């Protein structure tokens, strides 16, 4: 009998014997970028773009699931952009009021704050 990915994982988690060992993967951000070639900033910030990418990778590699790493997802990130520059294929610069960010297919976003952040003492944190 052939199992669906869900049935396979549930069988294994219930200590039953599935048709094969469930296979999952947690991709690095760099690996996901290289495979999918998305807009780097959208992939980082837009939860729907990120989720669609994970589903695509799961199908492409015939995984039974993907272990999700969380990134900078923010539903209103576009509303806070001062400027958005496409530097070249796979490289983007986003400027927000307090910082600039460089997004690429090859690395995590690099963030540069315009003013040095104020570090709170432990007693100042709720």
Question: What are these model-derived regions, one by one?
Answer:
Residues 1-126:
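Catalytic cores of TIM-barrel enzymes
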